[in-house]
Swiss-Prot record:
Record-linked NCBIfam families: PRK00197.1, proA
EC annotation from Swiss-Prot or TrEMBL: 1.2.1.41
Function according to Swiss-Prot or TrEMBL: Catalyzes the NADPH-dependent reduction of L-glutamate 5-phosphate into L-glutamate 5-semialdehyde and phosphate. The product spontaneously undergoes cyclization to form 1-pyrroline-5-carboxylate.
Organism: Ruegeria sp. (strain TM1040) (Silicibacter sp.)
Catalysed reactions, as listed in the record: L-glutamate 5-semialdehyde + phosphate + NADP(+) = L-glutamyl 5-phosphate + NADPH + H(+)
Major subcellular location class: cytoplasm
Family designation: Belongs to the gamma-glutamyl phosphate reductase family.
Name this polypeptide is given: Gamma-glutamyl phosphate reductase
GO biological process terms held by the UniProt record: L-proline biosynthetic process
InterPro entries: Ald_DH/histidinol_DH, Ald_DH_C, Ald_DH_N, Aldehyde_DH_dom, Glu-5-SA_DH, GPR_dom
Pfam families recorded: Aldedh (PF00171)
Keywords, ordered alphabetically: Amino-acid biosynthesis, Cytoplasm, NADP, Oxidoreductase, Proline biosynthesis
Gene3D superfamilies assigned to the protein according to its UniProt record, in alphabetical order: Aldehyde Dehydrogenase, Chain A, domain 1, Aldehyde Dehydrogenase, Chain A, domain 2
A GO-annotated cellular component: cytoplasm
Length: 421
């Protein structure tokens, strides 16, 4: 390893080793990758005490740094969350290997037999904030998809990430795969991020996972293609034909289950026909649950509601706060969402099939939901085992980015001495 003070040399060394490892990993068997991931899961559980101790150092660092309660929640690991990491690793291990899957095949009049086959991307750089579990999720998904990965976690999660990375390395060793297939940048120096964004000779794609500031920095300065995971400005629209119980259950879960995740609801739009009934009931229960409501003036609700300002529309709180507004129609709700959303996840609560069809047709978020909590906007809940993030762009990957989304394809063309006329 190069001197940690010489960041360009450090990152070039990491890049070279990642590229070499990617070439080996691309041809690794499905059984090897499955073995590596299960061995990593075993190591994480066996070393949970060490991981929690490392996390305690990060929590102290975060408190000293003045992190918000939402960021501290994202940073914290306990035995239950470590069990979640283990389960995620095993779920990815159990998935079908995407590499080598035949996506399409056909025969041309010339006699050429053509197959389109899934292949790894190569080397993926993942830049993320706070959540140490991303170390495991990203490492697992890149390994499953035959990609080498360079992980650059947040400065506040360095000790936790190092402990989890050690378990991934143990899994690679157990399966006789190159340890350089999953590397963690071993410094908090931000210059390492700048280097990673420009390593076109070694890195094939960058995946940023974090707040608007991080994603914006990556999009501005990266010379490598980017899968953008923007903030989750998530809307729920309560239609005039909403079912009361479904509305209450879905909205409360979408806002309060975990307030600091990107799938948490941030804005509630209520049709004026139900504002005095279902809408008020939902707002009353949110307030009783400790949620601070920033509402448009005149919206029926609890006395504790604050008057919303223009800054509340299009805001990702990541906290026990929600904006609320009355709308005259589904058209007004869709117009509001189009103006303020981040194309992440939006939801309609209704029993009207025509309203669902209009909502799904006229909005273009990566995930659109009907009568379901937006906290299901998660790769694990989509059956992907885990996710690197929710891609909100429109190129290549969109929605939860799992192992399959971390692949490309190539064409295999077979002839029999075939020549072109």
């Amino acid at each position: 390893m190069k001197d940690l003070e010489n960041i360009p040399a450090l990152m070039e060394d990491i890049g070279k080793r990642a590229k070499a490892a990617a070439q080996q990993l691309a041809t690794a068997s499905a059984a090897q990758k499955e073995q590596a991931l299960n061995a990593a899961a075993d190591a994480v559980w066996a070393q949970r005490g060490e991981i929690i101790a490392a996390n305690a150092k990060d929590l102290e660092f975060g408190r000293d740094k003045g992190l918000s309660s939402a960021m501290m929640d994202r940073l914290m690991l306990d035995e239950a969350r470590i069990q979640g990491i283990v389960d995620g690793l095993r779920a990815v291990a159990a998935q079908a290997d995407p590499v080598g899957a035949v996506l399409d095949e056909w025969t041309q009049p010339s006699g050429l037999r053509i197959q389109r086959v899934r292949t790894p991307l190569g080397v993926i750089g993942v830049i993320y904030e706070s959540r140490p579990n991303v170390t495991a999720d990203a490492g697992a998904l890149c390994l499953k998809s035959g990609n080498a990965v360079i992980l650059r976690g947040g400065s506040e999660s360095l000790h936790s990430a190092q402990a989890i990375h050690g378990c991934l390395a143990a899994g690679l060793r157990a399966a006789d795969l190159p340890e350089d297939a999953v590397q963690l940048v071993p410094t908090r120096d931000r210059a390492a991020v700048q280097e990673l964004l420009t390593m076109t000779a070694y890195v094939d794609v960058i995946v940023p996972r974090g707040g608007k500031g991080l994603v914006g920095l990556v999009q501005r300065e990266a010379r490598v293609p980017v899968f953008a995971h923007l903030e989750g400005i998530v809307h729920i629209y309560l239609d005039k034909d909403a079912d009361r119980k479904k509305a209450i259950d879905v909205v409360l879960n979408a806002k309060t289950r975990r307030t600091g995740i990107c799938g948490a609801a941030e804005c509630l739009l209520i049709h004026e026909d139900i504002a005095d009934s279902i809408g008020k009931d939902v707002l009353d229960l949110l307030a009783m649950g400790g949620v601070e409501i920033h509402a448009e003036e005149g919206l029926p609700g609890p006395d504790s509601m604050q008057v919303a300002t223009s800054e509340d529309w299009g805001k990702e709180y990541l906290d026990a706060i929600i904006a609320a507004k009355k709308v005259a129609s589904i058209d007004e709700a869709i117009a509001h969402i189009r103006r303020y959303h981040s194309a992440h996840t939006d939801c309609i609560i209704t029993e009207n099939d025509a309203a669902v069809a209009q909502f799904f047709s006229e909005l273009d978020s990566a995930i659109l939901m009907h009568n379901a909590s937006t906290q299901f906007a998660d790769g694990g809940e989509f059956g992907m085992g885990a996710e690197i993030g929710i891609a909100t762009g429109k190129m290549h990957a969109r929605g939860p980015v799992g192992a399959t989304q971390l692949t490309s394809f190539k064409y295999l063309v077979r002839g029999d001495g075939t020549v072109r006329a």
